[in-house]
């Protein structure tokens, strides 16, 4: 990074301190090659980027091999449609760690990542029921993503947390079942069942997390959240309930 190229207004006195450039050292670096494709899906323009290389910090390094999808124009549903087409092939999984997150972790000495038991659900003070539903599923997805990363990196104890996160999804769907009918999540629940069976029978973490069953189940949960897929199944009475106070719903 050439600090002299930064605009003068970023510096306290309007100019680069004389000795700053010599004192600043990078925490980590990324060195990767990017290939890009422009894809049209249902009238939307999507960029697919394939990055291959490594992220390094001191003596530590780990490989980069990832696909990124960016919607350039059009509908978000087109990105999800393309993602579904991609994960129907084995060898892909929905990751959660950015290059920067991995770089900072390496810069801290690459410590072992710890198991994180599921925390108490926290929502905004005036959240409605729908926001509570979303928060619960987002918590489950975050737990799934985090512990899947640990599991595939060699922490076998994280497998149980992955299964616990999937169970939390099921429990959430059941808890809100008085408002959101089961038929709204039939496809999602079917994919979760296939995913659980794959995880239970897999000979290794890599086999499980890079399977189409796991990838499609996790993406289905993401899509269910992003598109609010429960809404078309709500009648007028359910619409009223889901817009009501989450605190009142939880107290009951």
Predicted regions and their residues:
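Function-determining surface determinants
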Residues: 1-252
């Amino acid at each position: 990074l050439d600090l002299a190229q930064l605009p003068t207004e970023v510096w306290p006195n309007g100019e680069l301190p004389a000795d700053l450039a010599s004192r600043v050292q990078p925490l980590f670096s990324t060195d990767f090659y990017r290939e890009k494709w422009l894809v049209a899906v249902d009238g939307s323009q999507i960029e697919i980027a394939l990055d291959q290389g490594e992220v390094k910090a001191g003596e530590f390094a780990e490989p980069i091999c990832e696909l990124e999808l960016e919607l350039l124009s059009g509908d978000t549903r087109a990105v999800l449609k393309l993602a579904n087409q991609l994960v129907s092939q084995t060898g892909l999984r929905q990751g959660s760690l950015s290059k920067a997150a991995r770089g900072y972790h390496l810069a801290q000495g690459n410590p072992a990542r710890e198991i994180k038991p599921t925390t108490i659900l926290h929502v905004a003070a005036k959240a409605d029921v729908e926001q509570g539903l979303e928060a619960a599923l987002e918590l489950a997805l975050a737990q799934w993503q985090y512990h899947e990363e640990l599991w595939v990196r060699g922490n076998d104890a994280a497998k149980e947390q992955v299964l616990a996160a999937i169970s939390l999804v099921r429990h959430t769907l059941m808890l809100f079942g008085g408002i959101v009918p089961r038929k709204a999540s039939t496809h999602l629940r079917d994919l979760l069942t296939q995913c659980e069976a794959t995880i239970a029978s897999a000979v290794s973490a890599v086999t499980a997390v890079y399977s189409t069953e796991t990838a499609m189940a996790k993406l289905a949960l993401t899509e269910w959240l992003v598109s609010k897929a429960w809404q078309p199944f709500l009648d007028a009475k359910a619409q009223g309930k889901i817009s009501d106070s989450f605190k009142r719903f939880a107290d009951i």
